[in-house]
Amino acid sequence: MKTLALIIAGLGLVSGAFALVLQYSITVTEAMAGGRSLAGAVLFYFSFFTILANCAALISHLAQFLPFKFLDVLRTRSVGGAATTAMVMVAMVYSLILAPQGAPQGESVLCDVILHYITPTLMLAWWLVSAKGKVSLQSLVWWLVPPAVYLAFVYIRWFFVQEVSNPFLDPALGQYRLLSGIFGIVLLFVTTGLMVILLDKSVGKLKGRQGRYRSSARYASRRRLR
């Protein structure tokens, strides 16, 4: 299972890095052509939750291959669970809300497919294969911190440039629709986080039972040989 987890992490690392670099090239080039400065174009690129979530997944995958002690925190199940929750959210929000609003063109299609479907699927697959059943419900509280910080960043940026990256976060929607949308996203995030924790516990327990069964089978086989 450990080897399979590393293979999946490697696939997530390669595909995620490729799509992030390609999307960076597309976004920054188009943004600067539209009159933004280089700094403004880069900030615009990083204003999307999809990009930040994929960066988190990329770092989580990369940490699995680097032996440095200071990266141990990035290899914890809690950090992996936070990245997995964010990536599953990316896939769900995109497929349910954003994708129906418009189809990307050209190279952006490839980036959209990888960043919104392939990398989230690989992240979830890695989470299941590497499950240990040791993630606590308390971890969910910490998993809510990054999206809360992101939300603060969105509106601090909006205060200065009057622009948000996602239409359902636009203050122009009106207070009621905006707050309803934010509440819905928070509720979906909490539900997704609980699902991620439940999957870890369920698969972890199943692995434990299989391990005990194999140990018992080996022990019984040795006794018969005696």
Residue ranges and their predicted role:
Residues L13-A31:
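Alpha-helical transmembrane segments of multi-pass membrane proteins
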Residues P120-S136:
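Alpha-helical transmembrane segments in multipass membrane proteins, preferentially the mid-helix core
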Residues A41-A56, G181:
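Interfacial helix-start motif at the membrane-water boundary
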Residues P67-V79, A131-S139:
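Membrane-interface helix-boundary motifs at transmembrane edges
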Residues M1-G12:
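N-terminal membrane topogenic signal
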Residues V203-R226:
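Short, highly charged, low-complexity non-transmembrane loops/tails of multi-pass membrane proteins
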